[in-house]
Design a protein with these regions (language model features):
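Non-catalytic terminal and boundary segments that flank Rossmann-like NAD(P)-dependent oxidoreductase
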Residues: 1-31, 161, 167-177, 305-323
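Conserved glycine-rich cofactor-binding loop
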Residues: 38-39
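Rossmann-fold cofactor-recognition segment
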Residues: 76-93
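Catalytic loop of short-chain dehydrogenase/reductase
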Residues: 163-180, 184-237, 247-249, 255
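Conserved glycine-rich Rossmann-like NAD(P)H-binding loop of the short-chain dehydrogenase/reductase
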Residues: 54-70
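A short, exposed helix-loop element centered on a Lys and neighboring polar residues
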Residues: 155-156, 225
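C-terminal helical subdomain
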Residues: 8-9, 13-14, 243-244, 260-323
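Catalytic Tyr-X3-Lys loop
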Residues: 117, 125, 133-152, 170-176, ...
């Protein structure tokens, strides 16, 4: 993939600064949940957090046999506690019940009110190969129900303890649409949480015959930016959201919809790239990137050196209209 020149260095595999085994990137004491965590990019990211020493890694997906196989492999390799939950993120009630069950289980084990620390929003569906107006309505609907609405369902379930305390943001000074929200006396838990959205280069680059995937992923990433501005109103800004393109990773899901000749003609990035980058992005060192869309390929040390640019331009590396 052609480099968008944000950093001079464009990585295709892991490197020391994002190494999950580095003490600087430790996930010790953390509980991490990954949607679509049993295969492809999600599995690579789950593996990264196991490498980084996370206490518990929770895999969420639709097929139990795939979840069981992935969990067994991760536990055998790293000794990490791995939980699995079958859930269809398109089902809001089921997704909320799943996270309620996770919170209950974590709290029972520790005797305190516990929750997931890092949520990786990765599950997605890819429909491609047709012109825009040739997709059947059910295919259009499925793309948005998974890639956009499904992601909202997951984050709503994850942030259930925080939601009552999030104030409404006025459209204009003194103007708020909808019902008034009463938050007086409502206290947010204050637990530090991180949301990592696995976004895509196709949110801002036109790829032929990928209109549905591109549009639904774009909608998701843009909604996450709105959400960051809303939850920043909580005291202490306890939740940060990062959207990132994981690199060009050859996955079984992509192979299912792409011809073998096309797959073999492309220069792919190594799964170790998103594996390490996601772990680094969850650390305090990456806090200045919250609300932005970044590439896993970009060099993190060069990004850190650009911190002042991010502070001076709140729209830098966001999806917006620049004139």
């Amino acid at each position: 993939m052609e480099n968008i020149p944000v950093t001079k260095t464009f990585h295709h595999t892991t490197y020391p600064a994002i190494d999950p085994t580095s003490p600087a990137n430790s996930a010790a004491g953390k509980t991490v949940a990954v949607t679509g965590g049993a295969g492809g990019i999600g599995y690579a990211i789950s593996r990264g957090f196991c490498k980084a020493g996370a206490d518990t890694v929770i895999l969420l997906a639709r097929r139990q046999h795939v979840l069981s196989e992935a969990a067994a492999k991760l536990h055998a390799e790293f000794g990490t506690t791995v939980w699995t939950y079958t859930v269809d993120i398109r089902d809001a009630a089921s997704t909320s019940a799943t996270f309620a069950s996770i919170r209950k289980r974590l709290s029972e084990d520790s005797g305190e009110d516990e929750d997931v620390d890092v949520l990786v929003v990765n599950a997605a569906t890819l429909h491609q190969g047709e012109n825009v107006i040739e997709y059947e309505p059910e295919i259009v609907r499925d793309s948005f129900e998974t890639n956009t609405i499904g992601n909202i369902n997951v984050v709503r379930a994850f942030l259930t303890p925080e939601i009552p305390a999030i104030p409404k943001t006025p459209f204009l000074s003194g103007i708020t649409f909808g019902k008034k929200k009463e938050i007086a006396g409502v206290k947010a838990p204050g637990r530090q949480k991180v949301i990592l959205e696995v976004s895509s280069v196709s949110t801002h680059i036109l790829f032929p015959e990928q209109s549905l995937y591109s549009a639904s992923k774009l909608a998701s990433t843009h909604i996450f930016r709105f959400l960051q501005t809303e939850i920043d109103k909580l005291p202490g800004s306890p939740v940060r959201i990062h959207s990132f393109h994981p690199g060009a990773i050859r996955t079984p899901g992509l192979a299912d919809v792409t011809g073998e000749a096309d797959m073999n003609s492309f220069e792919w990035d190594d799964p170790s790239l998103p594996e390490g980058f996601a772990v680094w992005l969850s650390t305090p060192a990456a806090a200045f990137l919250k609300g932005r869309l970044v590439y896993a390929n970009w060099d993190v040390e060069e990004l850190i050196a650009m911190k002042k640019k991010f502070e001076e331009d709140p729209e830098y590396l966001t999806i917006t209209l620049k004139c």
